[in-house]
Amino acid sequence: ATIRVHDVRIQPRQGLPVVQWFYNDAILDWYRLKPFEEAFWTRVAPYMRNLVEHGQDTIYTPVFTPPLDGVKRPSQLLKIVRTGPDAYAFGWEDVKRYVDLATACGIRNFEWTHLFTQWGVKHAIRIYEGQGEEGRLLWPPETGATSNTYRAFLAQFLPEFKAFLDREGLLERSFFHVSDEPHG
């Protein structure tokens, strides 16, 4: 049998963002890296370029660990410090670095982490102190989606997130999750 291969390329889609989830924790596991250590940034860049080479223009950006993976391996870009009861400070440096690297690799749009758990939006997602390296959650996993604790967090996070998106020119190039499978 003979196989004939033709040199044909389909033009990238225009006006329809393309995204398949991109799991940083898989890269961390494969290369045995700590979340967002210097070696991570070198390893992740070729994967980002490969996404673009295969027609993807949007990347899932784990400002928090994706809720589906919250118990597997924390890999949140946002650094969070508890400054008091229901009070937090946020470090955006790694989020910015990730966005800048993805942009340099050809990514145009950004899909952001869910704000609530899947299967009915019943709970706050698992968000970690620091970047999750020690596995300390900011609240118990059963914390309600509308609890005072999570409302206090969102009241601090969302304005800072919006300011970050505005500052970086990302708001019009962003997609936001509330929850997956909301009716379970």
Ranges and model annotations:
Residues 1-184:
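Aromatic-lined carbohydrate-binding surfaces of glycoside hydrolases
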